[in-house]
Amino acid sequence: MSSGLKTIDLSNFDTSNVTTMGNMFDGCSSLTDLDLTNFDTSKVTSLSNMFQNCTNLKTLNISSFKTPALLYIAGMFNGCKSLIKLDLSNFDTSKVSNFSNLFQNCNSLEYLDLTSFNTSKGTQMVNMFRNCQKLKTLDLSSFNTSKIVIMSCMFYGCTSLVELNISSFDTSKVTDMSGMLCSCKALTELDLSNFNTSKVTNMSDMFNSCSSLTKLNLLKFDTSSLTDMSGMFY
């Protein structure tokens, strides 16, 4: 890893034939600004962990990224603790199956627009937004979760979230919801009345430390497959 790298100019790079950019800047912990608007990502299949642990990265311009061939995106921004906002409006995620750790530990992220995200092929969303401590609202109304199997710790540690609408989530195939909303300390109410939990085996710590939650509708929860409820409302 190039942990001492503070600036880098890649404006002359021709990336038109590149198929993988996984871990490209992983551990570049001294980088503060990065402009990749000239990058051609039309053939790229993997962006996994691309900016992982770029802990001081405050400005990242990837607004021009077009990703029609993208298959792997897990952990792309994991550990980008200084990023405040991200523009992913041009991302094509229609072929991606694993969204795990995507924004994990993006502690300073205040704005995130994912309305254009296609998650129809997704099967995993483990730790997807874990420890996004500055996010206050998150619109996931466009998410297709019909194939998702694991949602464990998806919103774990999103301590500033005051509004979260996941009422449209299709959870019919989900088996693991452990820690899903753990430490969402600012949430006061949550509508999960449409959740299909018939296949869920693990709900441990699901609402653990949701200290502001005053209203929770779980009347339609099917707990017949559950084997672990430890710490569920702790």
Region roles according to the model:
Residues 1-234:
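Negatively charged
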